Amino acid sequence: MTKKKNKKVTKSERGEANRRLAENRLARHQYEILETLETGIELVGTEVKSIRAGNTNLRDGFCLIREGELQLHNVHISPLNNAGNFFNHDPLRTRKLLAHRKEINKLEIQVARKGLTLIPLSIHLKGSWIKIIIGVGKGRKLHDKREDDKRKQANRDMKSALARYR
């Protein structure tokens, strides 16, 4: 009998298996994110190839809960150029998100009671699976955004002043 050799996974392979594919940076500016949830996403083959190539836009995306299912709307996944028109997918189709029933019920209660919204924050690989992180967010008003910008600017000024006097 021959023994099987244990194959060691290198750091570069591990990093490739857990890389971020798309991010919605604008969401963190427009919404105050209260809670996040990692879910799976139901995709077709050409969508998987396109997401892995980085051809995804999360900026206008949002999530809804309809008939007990979590759905992703308005996320643009570009069609593949070399797949032809017959096998390609609709770029803006509604996609089902995969989460446990308890998690969906918890999100549904939060969205209905507090007037919060569900926003896609990022898409990443977890092993060979494509996962999406959605956030429960409360919309920011203009004055909240200005306060945040002032606070960030003050921190930058303080760091630059400390760097000058070192």
From Swiss-Prot:
Residues 143-166 are annotated as: Disordered. Required for rescue of stalled ribosomes mediated by trans-translation. Binds to transfer-messenger RNA (tmRNA), required for stable association of tmRNA with ribosomes. tmRNA and SmpB together mimic tRNA shape, replacing the anticodon stem-loop with SmpB. tmRNA is encoded by the ssrA gene; the 2 termini fold to resemble tRNA(Ala) and it encodes a 'tag peptide', a short internal open reading frame. During trans-translation Ala-aminoacylated tmRNA acts like a tRNA, entering the A-site of stalled ribosomes, displacing the stalled mRNA. Keywords: Cytoplasm, RNA-binding. InterPro entries: SmpB, SsrA-bd_prot, SsrA-bd_prot_CS. It comes from the Bacteria. It is found in: Cytoplasm. This is SsrA-binding protein. GO terms for biological process: trans-translation. Disulfide bonds: none annotated. Belongs to the SmpB family. One of its GO terms (molecular function) is RNA binding. PROSITE patterns: SSRP.
